[in-house]
Design a protein with these regions (language model features):
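Core subunits and conserved enzymes of cellular information-processing
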Residues: 1-130
Length: 130
């Protein structure tokens, strides 16, 4: 089912590369703005998703190596998501991206499809119910 939300495209440029902190900050900002589901380059992000920088050379999500551009899709109220990212001086795009001369494009979209999570959910302290 297609849903409303935003698509954020993060791209490296000649002067600066998107790094893991840019990705993590974007995920946090989207969650704070009310995102109900998020994916990066087609990989569903859940509360147990492992986002890591490997050898200071690439970003890995769970077992998937990612390269720029990073296409981040978020389902939720597109107005709230966009305004949360675009706030002057305190929003993600102005504070993180523009200040560091990186490239980010934020677009509202009403045809977003985020795949189901296909990884294994592991728990340490709870057991599955019957």
């Amino acid at each position: 089912m297609l849903e409303d939300g935003v698509i954020v495209t993060l791209s490296d440029n000649a002067q600066s590369q998107i790094d893991i902190y840019d990705i993590l900050q974007l995920l946090n900002e989207l969650k704070l703005a009310g995102a109900e589901a998020i994916s990066i380059n087609g990989i569903r992000i859940v509360n147990t998703t492992d986002v890591a920088l490997i050898n200071n050379s690439y970003i890995k999500i769970d077992d998937n190596r990612l390269n720029s551009p990073y296409i981040v899709k978020a389902i939720g109220d597109p107005v709230k998501l966009e305004s949360g990212l675009m706030q002057k001086d305190s929003g993600y795009v102005d504070k993180i991206i523009n200040a560091m001369d990186k490239t980010a494009i934020v677009e509202r979209n009403d045809n977003i499809l985020i795949p189901k999570y296909d990884g294994k959910m592991t728990t340490k302290y709870i057991e599955m119910g019957e």
